[in-house]
Amino acid sequence: MKRLRAQVASFDRPARLLMVNQFAINCGFYMLMPYLADHLAHGLGLAAWAVGLVLGVRNLSQQGMFLVGGTLADRYGCKPMILAGCALRTVAFGLLAAAASLPVLILASALTGLAGALFNPAVRAYLAAEAGEERRVEAFATFNVFYQAGILIGPLAGLALLALDFTVVCTVAALIFGTLAVLQARALPVRPPADRGAEPIWRAVAADWRTIATNRPFVLFAAAMSGSYVLAFQVYLALPLQARELFGDRTGLVTGAIFSVSALAALSGQLKLTAWAKENLPGPRAIVYGLTAMGAAFVPLLPGSHGAVVGVGALTLCAALLAWGGALLYPFEMDTVVRLSGDRLVATYYGAYNTASGIAISLGNLAVGALFDTGVHWLPWAVLATTGFLCAGMVTRLNRAGYLTPRPTVVAVQG
């Protein structure tokens, strides 16, 4: 804790505000979302297809709009997009508190996703610009501590509020985002966007997107890293499925413990891992080590049968290694995206990167589900482990080929 306080204090006020902002964003989001499906199915009595539709709309609207959100941040400034995202979440969660019909639920879900697409790229671009090249890695490491703390505390707060009513959960979450919007409107300094000239907006945006699509190092890096997001998501898919197979009706307790282990491992290891890696490893090598650890996380689950004790140990070790691997690579990954952008259109690059990751998660989860349906116990874990090792190999090749060498700065980030 002392190390964290010192690290936070070393940054300027805007960076500190963004870190606290991300903690509150995740608290508000995760106090509600883990319990939404149960509320829709049992509280409102929706059919399973309708529950899937509502949740799917949220994911589609967020992943599909990340690129647009990043583009808007680069064109109009990061602060307006952060404020707009928080305001939209306030409205969306307020609608969820009152909604009883499917059309209103779909609208609320779409607004929830759109809000994330607006503020996520903007927050990261603002933080990258505020920290500067020398301190970007440390800034994103500290940012991730707050990010993970929100993931840990949010569901616990939601569970406590759920004892009252799901409407209370939605209302509190909406109030959190409303408060964030007001506080940041008053306290977050404006960073004017770069001068975009007199070119028509549609033509300028098309040129920006074309620049990103033809940035071969960035496209290859995004493709290589997409597997890491599929692996990280398995805390919510493959590990609970395995827990269900091992523990039946006690799955909820085991899954909750897995989530806690994952968040606590990231919280406890983030700053130490980053400090060690920055002192001993170049950025690309740190990413490779992180990907390797994430692939290795699934190896303990390969044996064909587990008793209860061994099963819990394997699941816990998998969750911890996934968290540590992700913590090791994350700050260097975020820094690499900025470097590959040439410090230009940073929010748009983050938006494109998030969109690619979201597509990978959707396709990867379909594949993982299909692998479980084969009934071959070891197959999902073997494929997941291999994915991590292949991604590590791809990043190694990109680095050796010189693709991850920083590009020269073209225009300083202003948005």
Where are these regions (language model features)?
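Juxtamembrane intracellular "pre-TM" segments in multi-pass secondary transporters
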Residues: 1-12, 189-221, 415
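Short amphipathic helix-loop junctions that connect adjacent transmembrane helices
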Residues: 34-49, 237-254
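Residue-level signature of mid-helix packing/kink "hotspots" within the transmembrane helices
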Residues: 59-67, 151-152, 263-271, 361-362
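Conserved MFS/SLC helix-loop-helix module at the cytosolic interface between two early adjacent transmembrane helices
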Residues: 63-100
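Helix-to-loop junctions at the C-terminal end of transmembrane segments
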Residues: 65-77, 268-283, 372
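Structural signature of the two symmetry-related core transmembrane helices
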Residues: 80-94, 285-300
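Cytoplasmic helix-loop-helix junction between adjacent transmembrane helices
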Residues: 109-148
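A membrane-interface helix-boundary motif in multi-pass transporters
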Residues: 162-175, 370-388
